[in-house]
């Protein structure tokens, strides 16, 4: 969700594919064939960034992108016009211009990013070991358990965290399906449940995807920090742990049926 917030500041779209470098690159090709201008891709590990015309992740390219962000600062043209540097431009578009300073550091940059609490991919709680090799069947059972959980917990989730609705989304290859009504359709692809507040703004999600090579499910949770107060940070941290635990327990229950 952080990426969507950043993209919105620049009035650009985010398109998502299933996990895997090939899926991301193929989706970009499909979009270009539809006359989209796709400048940057991402696949979440090992340097992540894929910058057109490259078709693979390149950590060195990512490092140089960070250096450009730090080094390209405001420039005054001969005609007196000021061309904003990359970070200054970001601060302006994101409503954080008051946080800009000329001699900024990478720490200053991170402070302007939308704040979320996200499960770390290398954390032990981000991996579950399952027995059911039929992921469609597992997710079908998970759907029944999740819908029961929602009916039991929706009042609590609204009172504590302002959650009023949810939507299931799946990614299979280069295809994304929103408003999923049958979780089993996601098969071995990624399945995400996005939670919304009363204004229909996304404030958290849970996600899972089974490994194609081992009996493991990768899971994660993402929770928006609503403001800069310490209370909001603490509450979001606690909710990420709570929501991921609910999610993991529902998967385990579905695997045991």
Residue spans of the language-model regions?
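Phosphate-binding and adjacent anionic-ligand microenvironments
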Residues: 1-222, 226-257
């Amino acid at each position: 969700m952080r990426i969507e917030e950043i993209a919105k500041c620049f009035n650009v779209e985010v398109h998502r594919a299933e996990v895997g470098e090939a899926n991301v690159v193929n989706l970009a090709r499909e979009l270009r064939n539809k006359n989209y201008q796709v400048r940057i891709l991402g696949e979440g590990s090992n340097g992540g960034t894929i910058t057109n015309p490259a078709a693979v992740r390149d950590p060195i390219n990512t490092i140089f992108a960070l250096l450009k962000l730090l080094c390209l600062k405001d420039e005054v043209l001969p005609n007196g016009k000021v061309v904003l540097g990359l970070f200054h431009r970001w601060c302006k578009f994101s409503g954080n211009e008051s946080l800009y300073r000329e001699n900024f550091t990478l720490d200053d940059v991170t402070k302007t990013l939308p704040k979320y609490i996200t499960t770390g991919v290398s954390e032990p709680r981000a991996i579950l070991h399952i027995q059911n090799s039929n992921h469609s069947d597992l997710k079908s059972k998970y759907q029944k358990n999740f819908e029961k959980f929602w009916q039991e917990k929706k009042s609590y989730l609204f009172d504590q965290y302002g959650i009023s609705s949810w939507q299931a989304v799946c990614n299979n290859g280069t295809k994304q399906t929103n408003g999923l009504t049958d979780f089993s359709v996601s098969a071995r692809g990624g399945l995400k449940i996005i939670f919304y507040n009363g204004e229909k703004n996304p404030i958290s999600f849970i996600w899972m995807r089974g490994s194609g090579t081992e009996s493991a499910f990768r899971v994660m949770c993402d929770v928006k920090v609503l403001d800069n107060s310490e209370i909001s940070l603490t509450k979001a941290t606690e909710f990420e742990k709570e929501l991921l635990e609910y999610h993991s327990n529902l998967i385990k229950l579905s695997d045991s049926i």
